[in-house]
Amino acid sequence: MRQKITIFVVTDQDSPALLKCGIVLYILIMKSRKRSFQKNVLNHCYQRTADGGVIFYSNLDYLVWFTIVCATARKRKVRILAMCPMPDHTHFSIEAASSSELAAFMRDYSSLFVLEHNKICHRKGPLFDTPFGSAPKYSDKMVRTNLIYVWNNPPERKLIGKSEDYRWTFLAYAVSDHPFSKKLVVRNSRWPVQKAVKEIMTQFNAGRHLPYALLKRLYEPLTADEKQQLTDFIISTYNVIDYNAALKYFNSYEDLLLAVHSTTGSEHDIKESFVGKTDKDYSAMVRILLRELQPKDIHDILALPQEEKYELFLLLRRLTYAKTEQIAKFLHLAVKRN
């Protein structure tokens, strides 16, 4: 949350007492801006875009993001208990040895993802708002509440009925390496699948993420079922989420699901703002534009001039139930109200 601070200018011509008060006030302000942190205490980290716009338009967006996060987490030796990318923001429940290590992880992963994102979306400049939001969770109850809150983001935004049924909470991967597809038996698979698995393992073993160009090439010759299998394989291979650490707060996976289903969790330390009744509107807009415009890639739409984006804005306003602000967020378009 941004705070409005009133600054009093005190000079050496003022009384010594007033000058001393000014110095104390400055110190208090600077301390208040320092990130609250405690070693190996779980932190809820939150990111949104600088312009409030959408981040994720396709499954490839989520996969690029996920593999970058996991590769960076291994290098920075942070422990992730939960994470959930939402269409226009991201959540992490994460432990780190120091505040600088946490900041380094967020910086490194964000920088790499922004490079990939900007390239595919034909844009320049920063993507995420800075600094990222974070709030430490000092008690077991606070940790449980936060984990539930992160996992329940998709149901709360009506993307799914149950958290574990939504691939991008990664909850289902706690008990299965292929929760959304048939088990992949590589030796019995078609050559394009075998080739894809080999290239993915080469990237993974080298500590590298999966870039857009590689993923687009690997997915292009696959059937719908094979794409689901490969997605499960990628997530299970790269996954760094410490499910055992998370389960300690719930005793078992069954108890975890019971807690997630019975309460939404809460977050009082980080202020989130939501637009519209459901985030399903964003995927609906993707389907409409793919049908109406038939672009080679949905991201190409983001490179259109503002005038053409405004024409799409009018189209989407006519064909969807999305709010004006949601359509503007989707197109990264500034819409003036009369």
What are the residue ranges of the model-derived segments?
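Short Pro-Cys-Gly-centered "Cys-loop" motif that presents a nucleophilic cysteine in a tight turn
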Residues: 1-82, 96-338
